[in-house]
């Protein structure tokens, strides 16, 4: 009887854990999409690189305190692993945030989110070349479709204004940071405990972000309730919560499968921007969003049977 009760409790625990794991991608999409909206609000009163620097320093401080309180060892970062985590953090959290935040000053959030949808497409393509992952025909179709969707919006932006085009180019630089950081993490950091790895990543990113704010802009700030709320949300919920969820997805699967969860981000961010910021969506942007999201979905839907089997085992 006692053994049956123990087995029942174990089954319930496993079911609960499995259910939590299944909703991780949805939670990530909602958090990541919201960051474009709250960043827009914060950038009304904060210069972009200062916004990013405060966000990254806040994350680094919180995680360092958690490390001290929990008395976690730094030993898992021995043998040069700390360096790999630092590189991944600089790419994912510094380059991946600094460029698109500058872009958000002049470019609608929906269009920035659309360019960010290139992340799973480029990650999947690079995974084939660098990590020996394999893609199915449907996923190659998804890559082409997504690129066409983003190209449609970028082409239209080039005709609208130079500032809009520059913003989208900066957003693409952020994508390159995310892709490089994702691949680097998948290659060198997957066996590092989450807390230790994340702490080093944010310490590195905070250093790069602070240096960028000091050298690349003239910082300005005006603290309002909206600004404070935006900084807190993007620091605690998006950077800490969102990147933790992303790391969980990376550890449990291939880099292509993890980053493919971005396919819902453009549409979700566009709807949030329309509802909360009053951003209007032109016909070509809507078409581009649909094409890019469909492309990312194709990459994601076909990932399970083929992608990551060799990497995750």
Provide a role label for each language-model segment:
Residues 1-27, 61-88, 101, 105-106, ...:
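Membrane-interface interhelical linkers
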Residues 47-59, 102-119, 164-176, 226-236:
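Structural signature of hydrophobic alpha-helical transmembrane segments
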Residues 33, 37, 64, 89-94, ...:
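Hydrophobic/small/kink-forming positions within alpha-helical transmembrane segments
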Residues 23, 27, 53-58, 83, ...:
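Hydrophobic residues within alpha-helical transmembrane segments
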Residues 30-61, 106-111, 180-205, 218, ...:
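Juxtamembrane helix-loop-helix junctions in multi-pass membrane proteins
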Residues 52-54, 93, 97, 110-118, ...:
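Helix-helix packing/entry segments at the starts of transmembrane helices
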Residues 6, 63, 126, 135-157, ...:
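Hydrophobic transmembrane alpha-helices of multi-pass small-molecule transport proteins
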Residues 35, 58-62, 115-129, 144, ...:
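Alpha-helical transmembrane segments of compact multi-pass small-molecule transporters, enriched
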């Amino acid at each position: 009887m006692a053994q049956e009760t123990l087995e029942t409790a174990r089954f319930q625990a496993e079911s609960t854990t499995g259910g939590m794991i299944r909703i991780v991608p949805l939670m990530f999409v909602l958090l990541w999409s919201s960051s474009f909206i709250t960043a827009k609000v914060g950038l009304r009163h904060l210069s972009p690189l200062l916004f990013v620097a405060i966000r990254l320093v806040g994350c680094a401080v919180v995680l360092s305190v958690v490390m001290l309180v929990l008395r976690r060892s730094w030993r898992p970062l021995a043998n040069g692993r700390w360096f790999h985590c630092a590189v991944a953090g600089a790419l994912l959290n510094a380059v991946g945030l600094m460029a698109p935040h500058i872009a958000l000053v002049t470019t609608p959030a929906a269009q920035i989110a659309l360019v960010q949808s290139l992340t799973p497409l480029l990650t999947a393509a690079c995974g084939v070349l660098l990590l020996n992952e394999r893609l199915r025909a449907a996923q190659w179709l998804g890559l082409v479709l997504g690129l066409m969707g983003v190209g449609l919006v970028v082409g239209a932006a080039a005709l609208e204004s130079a500032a809009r085009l520059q913003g989208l180019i900066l957003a693409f630089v952020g994508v390159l940071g995310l892709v490089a950081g994702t691949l680097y993490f998948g290659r060198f950091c997957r066996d590092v405990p989450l807390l230790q790895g994340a702490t080093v990543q944010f310490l590195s990113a905070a250093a790069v972000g602070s240096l960028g704010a000091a050298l690349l802009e003239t910082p300005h700030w005006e603290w309002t309730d909206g600004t404070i709320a935006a900084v807190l949300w993007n620091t605690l919920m998006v950077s800490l919560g969102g990147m933790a969820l992303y790391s969980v997805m990376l550890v449990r699967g291939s880099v292509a499968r993890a980053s493919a969860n971005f396919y819902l981000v453009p549409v979700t961010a566009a709807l949030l921007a329309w509802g909360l910021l009053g951003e209007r969506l032109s016909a070509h942007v809507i078409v581009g969003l649909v094409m890019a999201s469909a492309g990312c979905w194709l990459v994601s839907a076909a990932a399970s049977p083929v992608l990551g089997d060799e990497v995750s085992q």
